Each structure stands twice: as structure tokens, then as C-alpha cells.
């Protein structure tokens, strides 16, 4: 029996907050898991320290599925972002340990590689259409084959996805939540213009993506999807609030633009209808928020039966530990579609040294045993936690709205 003898939570803020779980076994092997929940980090810290770690000590680190079921079924209050993020951290760390003991990169334990690398997309944004296209050209020069485009909307003081620091977008900030302003009518007039200009400027050989970030009703989303059809988007993301599964049926009736959703999903029940009825094309659920590698592989297998591909969330609110875990997952599932890749800051990369690398539009997890990522605890300690909130959104008349 390979006993878990220690588990600790490490919180660090090398530019933004990250929560890491580190598990140690009786033979001295360690594994790491990401436990970051953007804007609610300390809730997961408490859940791990107060409710999970006491139950982890003494368990067999080899029994990953059993440990997963113990914490999922045994909690009674199943699911939810806090519990599933904490469970994902445990799951990642145990897979890291198992692959290290096997002396091979995790993707080999998951069935081996289904492809040579993982195609990723970057984020191009700007205050104007021209600025966004200029940023997109930079990604093309770096070899990206897929690029998400976001631009400022005329008449609105701020827009989701647009930041001053182009490569390292981070919406969360300190003190109290920033209040943004939204206008659906202004946005719907502007978005098609962005993609008309982008397709003309960037050509037909690059995949273009766009994130609505839950801002539309189903009929509005159907209209937008129809308007964007001439520009052949790879996907339209989060067109409506993700919990509105039935709403995607109405969108499907009005457009052939591919649809993606799911970064806030924590279990298959959040997307069962979407998958079974083929109401989406890409599932954005993450290793981190969907209960870890163990659970996401089950969801992906179910999606594969219905011709739905994966498109995991991969913004900078996930640490390099999740990025590494996602790449092992991506490389090993047959229905992989695309992986989001927002580059971390140099400070973050220093705290989380990793084996994964980028080349010609693709990431590869590397050949190091385990996840191929670690945490420099001494360096992490130099970046203490800083309270931060995600923004909130209001309509122009002051009504609270979806951010």
C-alpha cells in the first residue's frame, strides 16, 4: 500500500492568485494539483484543509478512482465549483504520483498519444478592430493556427476580453469588483464588422474564434451566429448563460456557426442534454473545475459518442499545473478539438517550472515523468495572496447583468 502521509495547500500570487495542493506518499514521491477558483480561491483552500486533507491521510495513493468516489459520493452535497475544484486538485496530484512511479509522462498511462501535439489558440484583443487585427498578426507570426478575437465596442467604456497587457489578460482585480457596462444592441452591430475585417486581413487559413461570455439570449445568439456565418468561425463561445441548456436548441435552429460552452461546468449533468442532442460542437469543461482528469475523461468519452469534441478552457486563471494536466488529457483523447492557451507571466512560469513547450501552433506536455510540472515553494512564498474579484456587469440603465 502506498500511503498518503502528508498533504498541504500552498497559496501564491505571482501576478494573480493560485492555489496548489501537494501530496506526499510513504515512499517520498510527491504530486501536485491545481485548486484555483478565480475570485473564490480561499473557499477552496478551506474546503481542502478543513474537509478533505484529514480524510486523505493514510489512504492508498494508487486507488485514484476509489479516492475520487469517496470524496464525490461521500460529501452528500455533491458537485459545485468549490467541491469539484478541490476534488480535481486531489485527482491531479494522485495521477502525477502514479505516472512518476511508472517513470513515464502521464499521457502514456492514459492510453498514449492520439496525435503529435495539441493545437492551441491565442487571444488577440484591442480597443479597435484595427488594434485587434494587429495583435492577431503577431500570433500568426508566432505560428498560431487559431486565434480568438475580441475588440472594444464603440460606445462602451470597457469590453470583456480587452486589456492593456495584450498577452496576459487578467480580469480579476483587488478591492471591490469592477462594474462594467454592457449594451447588447451595440455589441450585435459591432461583432460582425470585426470578423468581416479580420477575415479579409488575416486570410482563410487561420481559425477564428469569439467569446460572447454569456451575454445574449438564445434568439440574439442565433442572430449573431447567422450574421457570422460568412466568416466561418471555428466556434462561437458562451453565447448564452451556460446553465440554459434548452436555449441552445433555439440557437441551433437559426445558425450553423459551431457552438462551444462549458468552462463553468463541473459534471456531466451540466452538459448531458447539450451533448445528447448535439446542441454544441465543442465542450469547454476543464480538468480543474470538472473534477480532475478522472471525471473529465468520462465526460469526454460520453461526448465522443455524440460527435462533440473537446475544447478545454485554458486562461491564466488556471495555473501551469492545470495546463500540464490538460495537455496530457488533450493528447490522449480521440475527440480532441482545440486547447485554449493564454501565456502565463514570467513570474508565474518561474514559480511553476514545467516541461510543456510551444512550437508551430501546438503545445506538447513533454516527456518528464508525471505531469511534468512542479512548484517552487520558496519562490511561491515571496508572492503572498492578494484579494481579487472578478468584475460584475450592468446594462446601460443600471440593471445587473451577466458578466
From Swiss-Prot:
- Residues folding into a coiled coil are none
* This protein's record includes keyword Endoplasmic reticulum: no
Where, by residue number, does Mg(2+) bind?
211, 237, 263
Which keywords annotate this record?
Carbohydrate metabolism, Lyase, Magnesium, Metal-binding
Domain of life, per UniProt, equals Bacteria
SUPFAM superfamilies on file: Enolase C-terminal domain-like (SSF51604), Enolase N-terminal domain-like (SSF54826)
* Marked site positions, Important for activity and substrate specificity: 315
**Which residues of the sequence carry a binding annotation for substrate?**
38, 123, 263, 284, 313, 317, 340
Entry's cofactor comment: Binds 1 Mg(2+) ion per subunit.
Q: What class of enzyme is it?
A: lyase
Q: What does it catalyze?
A: D-mannonate = 2-dehydro-3-deoxy-D-gluconate + H2O
PROSITE patterns tied to this protein: MR_MLE_1
Extract one GO molecular function annotation from the record: mannonate dehydratase activity
The UniProt record lists the EC number as 4.2.1.8
Q: Which cofactor(s) does the record list?
A: Mg(2+)
Q: Which PANTHER family match?
A: D-GALACTONATE DEHYDRATASE-RELATED (PTHR48080), STARVATION-SENSING PROTEIN RSPA (PTHR48080:SF6)
Q: What does this protein do?
A: Catalyzes the dehydration of D-mannonate. Has no detectable activity with a panel of 70 other acid sugars (in vitro).
Family indicated by similarity: Belongs to the mandelate racemase/muconate lactonizing enzyme family. GalD subfamily.
Q: Return the protein name.
A: D-mannonate dehydratase Caul1427
**Species:** Caulobacter sp. (strain K31)
Read off the lineage from the record.
Answer: Bacteria, Pseudomonadati, Pseudomonadota, Alphaproteobacteria, Caulobacterales
Amino acid at each position: 500500500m502506498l500511503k498518503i502521509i502528508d498533504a498541504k495547500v500552498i497559496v501564491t500570487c505571482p501576478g494573480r492568485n493560485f492555489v496548489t495542493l501537494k501530496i506526499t506518499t510513504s515512499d517520498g514521491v510527491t504530486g501536485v494539483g491545481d485548486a484555483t477558483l478565480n475570485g473564490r480561491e480561499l473557499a477552496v483552500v478551506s474546503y481542502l484543509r478543513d474537509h478533505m486533507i484529514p480524510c486523505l491521510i493514510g489512504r492508498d495513493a494508487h486507488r485514484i478512482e476509489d479516492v475520487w468516489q469517496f470524496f464525490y459520493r461521500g460529501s452528500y452535497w455533491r458537485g459545485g465549483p468549490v467541491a469539484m475544484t478541490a476534488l480535481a486538485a486531489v485527482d491531479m496530484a494522485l495521477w502525477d504520483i502514479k505516472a512518476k512511479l511508472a517513470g513515464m509522462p502521464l499521457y502514456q498511462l492514459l492510453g498514449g498519444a492520439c496525435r503529435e501535439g495539441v493545437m492551441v489558440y491565442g487571444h488577440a484583443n484591442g480597443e479597435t478592430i484595427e488594434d485587434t487585427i494587429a495583435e492577431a498578426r503577431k500570433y500568426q507570426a508566432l505560428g498560431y493556427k487559431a486565434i480568438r478575437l475580441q475588440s472594444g465596442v464603440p460606445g462602451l467604456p470597457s469590453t470583456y476580453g480587452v486589456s492593456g497587457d495584450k498577452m496576459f489578460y487578467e480580469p480579476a482585480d483587488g478591492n471591490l469588483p469592477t462594474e462594467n457596462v454592457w449594451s447588447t444592441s451595440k455589441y450585435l452591430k459591432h461583432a460582425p464588422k470585426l470578423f468581416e475585417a479580420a477575415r479579409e486581413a488575416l486570410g482563410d487559413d487561420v481559425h477564428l474564434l469569439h467569446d460572447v461570455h454569456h451575454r445574449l439570449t438564445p434568439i440574439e445568439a442565433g442572430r449573431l451566429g447567422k450574421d457570422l456565418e460568412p466568416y466561418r468561425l471555428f466556434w462561437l463561445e458562451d453565447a448564452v448563460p451556460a446553465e440554459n441548456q434548452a436555449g441552445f436548441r433555439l440557437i441551433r435552429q437559426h445558425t450553423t456557426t459551431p457552438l462551444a460552452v462549458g468552462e463553468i461546468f463541473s459534471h456531466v449533468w451540466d452538459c448531458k442534454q447539450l451533448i445528447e442532442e448535439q446542441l454544441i460542437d465543442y465542450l469547454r469543461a476543464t480538468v480543474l473545475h470538472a473534477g480532475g482528469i478522472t471525471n473529465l475523461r468520462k465526460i469526454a468519452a460520453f461526448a465522443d459518442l455524440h460527435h462533440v469534441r473537446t475544447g478545454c478552457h485554458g486562461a491564466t486563471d488556471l495555473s501551469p499545473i492545470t495546463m500540464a494536466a490538460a495537455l496530457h488529457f488533450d493528447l490522449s483523447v480521440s475527440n480532441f478539438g482545440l486547447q485554449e492557451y493564454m501565456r502565463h507571466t514570467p513570474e508565474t512560469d518561474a514559480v511553476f517550472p514545467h516541461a510543456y513547450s510551444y512550437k508551430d501552433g501546438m503545445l506538447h506536455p513533454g516527456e518528464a515523468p508525471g505531469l511534468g510540472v512542479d512548484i517552487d515553494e520558496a519562490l511561491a512564498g515571496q508572492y503572498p495572496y492578494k484579494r481579487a474579484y472578478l468584475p460584475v456587469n450592468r446594462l446601460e440603465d443600471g440593471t445587473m447583468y451577466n458578466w
